[in-house]
């Protein structure tokens, strides 16, 4: 199933990957600068503050590996600092966009607070940025969720079929 869901023609463009070693406050600037350097239009941003190793083969996806982030405040601040400049660039260029927030797996109180915060961030920003056609969506993996499941959902949301989703949270692996 993954091979058909993640076929290259679903997402056209350039893949950008930035490490969390870049200061979070400068992440958005780095995204915009790198896209300008490549003369690429970035219309999808994936924020992964979980610290998992992320390999991006999908074009027009910016992956942020937040390996150095520890608590819920770091996760939420990092997500906001990554999303805001990208959304600002889309608004200025009058372009739509997808902001995909990948939450950490369930765990202690800090992980649960970060998950709830990212879900609320997606809901709130979907209302604030709907007039600009910017679609924030959160993915909340369960304890037993496989990386392929997250990848398939992310590919679906980044495809034209995912254009109808905004401000929602997808909880994977829960009954």
Task: Give short role names for the model-derived ranges.
Residues 2-141, 154:
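Rossmann-like short-chain dehydrogenase/reductase
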Residues 81, 131-134, 138-175:
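C-terminal helical subdomain
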């Amino acid at each position: 199933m993954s091979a058909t869901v993640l076929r290259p023609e679903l997402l056209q463009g350039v893949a950008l990957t930035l490490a969390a070693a870049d200061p979070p406050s400068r992440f958005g600037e780095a995204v915009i600068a790198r896209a300008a350097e490549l003369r690429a239009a970035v219309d999808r941003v994936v924020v992964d503050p979980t610290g998992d190793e992320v390999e991006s083969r999908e074009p027009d996806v910016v992956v942020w590996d937040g390996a150095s982030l520890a608590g819920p405040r770091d996760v939420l601040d990092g997500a906001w600092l990554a999303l805001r400049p990208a959304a600002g660039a889309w608004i200025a260029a009058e372009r739509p966009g997808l902001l995909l927030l990948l939450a950490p797996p369930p765990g202690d109180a800090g992980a649960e607070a970060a998950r709830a915060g990212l879900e609320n961030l997606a809901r709130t920003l979907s209302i604030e940025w709907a007039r600009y056609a910017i679609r924030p969506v959160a993915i909340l993996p369960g304890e037993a969720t496989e990386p392929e499941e997250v990848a398939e959902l992310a590919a679906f949301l980044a495809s034209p079929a995912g254009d109808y989703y905004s401000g929602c949270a997808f909880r994977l692996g829960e009954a």
